[in-house]
Amino acid sequence: MKRIAVLTSGGDAPGMNAAIRAVVRKAISEGMEVYGINRGYAGMVDGDIFPLGSKEVGDKISRGGTFLYSARYPEFAQLEGQLAGIEQLKKHGIEGVVVIGGDGSYHGAMRLTEHGFPAVGIPGTIDNDIAGTDYTIGFDTAVNTAVEAIDKLRDTSSSHGRTFVVEVMGRNAGDIALWAGIASGADQIIVPEEEFDIEKVASTIQYDFEHKGKNHHIIVLAEGVMSGEAFAQKLKEAGDKSDLRVTNLGHILRGGSPTARDRVIASWMGSHAVELLKEGKGGLAVGIHNEELVESPILGTAEEGALFSLTEEGKIIVNNPHKARLDFAALNRSLSQ
């Protein structure tokens, strides 16, 4: 394989630029040419494709976001969109693609592979909700950003004796809420993987104020449960009488310079993706499991909620985020006593 392309798709995540940089520089070191595709699959279909060299990725490792831009392009789920994209790839002499993104991006990579066009996926999403890997690019940075924000909210919460509901991103996964909640010493963490009793949440707030000598209370809420405003309303209906405030950290979690960990795993996975394409392997997703590089069939990792995937050698990679998140939730309850 002499010429490959790289794209980012879906929601942006800190560390994507580090992955792009690794793909480009590793490919060049292997004697391959690299092209960048702007705006993900939309740019592929539009032919927004251009050469990338070492100069173009210089100083990008520390930058958040993605300099290749990103977009959601549901039209690529249709055969017409897929064939149009492949036509553009062939027009530019591209023989394989590295796709950086979440489960939607993986579905696009899977379709390319089904059409006989090798594609390798790299997990890039702050949600950490991709099967076949312990960590996704951007998750560590998002957690650190959330912790920094919650620490600051605690300052004002304690100054005024208030309860804060802090809503964080995560869609159907509570990883950001759990990790950030534990690291910031949150009093309660609410995630979609675990049922909660709103009356118990309210009574816990009251008990902390009246019997534990606390003058403030922090609740970290994953957006997949409900919005922070809706949760606060339910708390009031359940009898909470504390001075309640809601803060939605929102898209701030996607921004910022990536942490050292995100830069390292992005570089590691980007380099390995190139190695796979050089060997002519497609339809695979790169991941990190037990601090080791692994690859899994993209078909299994692209299925939302998949609890495991298989390597080419048939090795099972357990990916049971539900159990892990419940274990973390139990840990936080024991620490918030």
Curated annotation (Swiss-Prot):
Enzyme Commission number: 2.7.1.11
GO biological process: canonical glycolysis; fructose 1,6-bisphosphate metabolic process; fructose 6-phosphate metabolic process
InterPro entries (alphabetical): ATP_PFK, ATP_PFK_prok-type, PFKA_ATP_prok, Phosphofructokinase_CS, Phosphofructokinase_dom, PKF_sf
Keyword match NAD: no
Principal EC category: transferase
Top-rank taxon, per record: Bacteria
Binding site for ATP: 11, 72-73, 102-105
Annotated localization: Cytoplasm
Activity modulation: Allosterically activated by ADP and other diphosphonucleosides, and allosterically inhibited by phosphoenolpyruvate.
Function: Catalyzes the phosphorylation of D-fructose 6-phosphate to fructose 1,6-bisphosphate by ATP, the first committing step of glycolysis.
Name of the protein this chain belongs to: ATP-dependent 6-phosphofructokinase
